[in-house]
């Protein structure tokens, strides 16, 4: 199920760390991805696609939400997770991912205190060793609420940045891990 179609020797040190973290994450959740029930999830707006793998015991799910092309001022996105236990409580967490600073191109020079070239030495060096957190998200909800869809953080619209902002752009995507809360785990939504 997991594969990379790229030359690993051409990756920056930052990208190599990201690939290693992705492989470790996949190994941990492989049973759900390989043996869970697989669903194409209905989506509320055009341009998005979603797939979910739900563990047979309904205690865990992995959901992909992907965007084809970015649109100006998109409506709020919702994450829908089918086939969970309606009365059970779940924690939803965005699988950590990062975005290269270079993705912002010439926008960086507008916020930097000194004049920088978008393809100059400083930004190329930063890009090799640092990336911005993308789309940090955690929520708790019932299986019924997840089946109806819960709202997600906004996407980047050209200005401003915070860790929870989704920096998708064209063909952007995010994986979400959904895990049932144990009886001894605190429900942070009360």
Language-model-derived ranges and their functions:
Residues 161, 165-173, 179-190:
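Mature N-terminal, pre-catalytic/accessory segment of carbohydrate-active enzymes
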Residues 1-152, 156, 176:
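Active-site-proximal substrate-binding groove within the catalytic cores of carbohydrate-active enzymes
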């Amino acid at each position: 199920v997991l594969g990379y179609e790229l030359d690993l020797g051409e990756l920056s040190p930052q990208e190599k760390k990201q690939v290693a973290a992705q492989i470790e994450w996949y190994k941990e959740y492989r049973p759900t991805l390989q043996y869970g029930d697989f669903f194409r999830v209905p989506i509320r707006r055009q341009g998005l696609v979603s797939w979910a793998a739900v563990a047979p015991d309904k205690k865990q799910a992995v959901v992909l939400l992907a965007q084809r092309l970015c649109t100006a001022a998109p409506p709020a996105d919702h994450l829908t997770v089918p086939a969970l236990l309606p009365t059970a409580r779940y924690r939803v967490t965005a699988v950590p991912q990062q975005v290269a600073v270079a993705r912002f191109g010439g926008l960086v020079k507008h916020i930097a205190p000194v004049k920088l070239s978008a393809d100059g030495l400083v930004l190329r060096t930063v890009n090799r060793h640092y990336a911005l957190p993308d789309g940090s998200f955690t929520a708790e909800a019932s299986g019924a609420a997840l089946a109806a869809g819960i709202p997600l953080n906004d996407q980047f619209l050209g200005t401003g940045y915070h860790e929870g902002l989704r920096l998708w752009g064209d063909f952007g995507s995010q994986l979400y891990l959904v895990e049932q809360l144990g009886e001894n785990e605190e429900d942070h939504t009360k």
